[in-house]
Regions:
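Short alpha-helical segment immediately N-terminal to, or the first helix within
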Residues: 1-2, 116-117, 130
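Short, charged phosphate-coordinating catalytic segments
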Residues: 2-33, 125
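Phosphate-coordinating loops and pocket residues in cytosolic domains that bind phosphorylated ligands
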Residues: 14, 22, 141-144, 159
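C-terminal secondary-structure termini that scaffold catalytic or DNA-interacting sites
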Residues: 24, 37-39, 43-51, 55-60, ...
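Active-site/catalytic core of tyrosine-dependent DNA strand-transfer enzymes
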Residues: 24, 32-35, 57-102
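Catalytic-site neighborhood detector that most strongly recognizes the C-terminal catalytic loop/helix
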Residues: 33, 86, 124, 131-156
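Short basic/aromatic active-site micro-motif
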Residues: 83-85, 102-121
């Protein structure tokens, strides 16, 4: 979910079964998990644009549907990942060590998702909408990853001039 949808870790940890629409293949992001003064708290998302509906890849939709079927007693509005951010970080460290790879931050999965979408040719506006960036300027922080299309533009202008 973190990598394939580009959601924030607090958004992941606040997910409940009712956030999923498997027929539509979507997940609704409308809340965030925080641990404040030793208590689990569900809050509104980071920004207004963080409230969004994300279309999931089909394979992920199937995996999440299977994951939810494993729970017998999870209520419709109970968190499906009942762990803390600290636990996620611990498991990321443990997994990286076991795999013998460099540790990355949980948030780097979100950055990797955005980088992948840029590499796939999606516009900054479409990406900002998917990941809940309040301003497209935030997405443009990844500007160095957007490929230059100057050659393609010049070639197409040549074709236009030639009447092709």
């Amino acid at each position: 979910m973190l990598y394939w949808c580009g959601i924030r870790e607090g958004e992941l940890l606040a997910l409940t079964p009712t956030d999923f629409d498997f027929e539509a293949g979507t997940v609704s992001i409308s809340k965030s998990y925080q641990r404040l003064k030793g208590k689990d708290v569900i809050t509104t998302p980071k920004t207004k644009k963080s409230n969004r509906v994300i279309k999931m890849p089909k394979f992920l939709c199937g995996e999440m549907e299977d994951y939810l079927k494993m729970f017998y007693s999870t209520g419709a509005n109970e968190r499906i990942f009942p762990v803390s951010k600290h636990y996620l970080h611990h498991e990321m460290d443990r997994g990286a060590k076991a795999a013998g790879v460099k540790r990355i931050r949980i948030h780097d999965l979100r950055h990797s998702h955005i980088s992948l979408l840029i590499d796939m040719g999606f516009t900054a506006l479409a990406i900002a909408d998917r990941v809940g960036h309040e301003s497209i300027d935030i997405t443009y922080r990844y500007a160095h990853l957007f490929p230059t299309r100057q050659t393609e533009m010049a070639d197409r202008l040549d074709m236009e001039r030639k009447g092709a």
